[in-house]
Amino acid sequence: MPTLIVLFNLRDDASVQAYEDWAQTVDVPTVTGLGSVDAFSVHRVSGLFGADSPAPYGYVEVIEVNNLDALVQDVSSEVMAAVSAQFQTFTDAPVFMLAERFAGP
């Protein structure tokens, strides 16, 4: 099962509270409602383990995908286009990485 991992920071002009409220009320419910997605979680990064330097990203999204071709279709819908446009108003240069689990449960 592929996993989409998204790393990002908020834009300087984005409100943390507005983004986190939007993520909980719009982003997560919409994405978890897609037939191609089994699970979706958003994580606030609190720091680098064992280091005093700041983390390079403030947020991480983890999207467990059950069908990558179906996800491509799902994200091209009008609803997801609107959600994506809203996401872009909050985020600064998000990085979308596709990963495959090869070890562990």
Located regions from the model:
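Macromolecular interaction modules
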Residues: 1-105
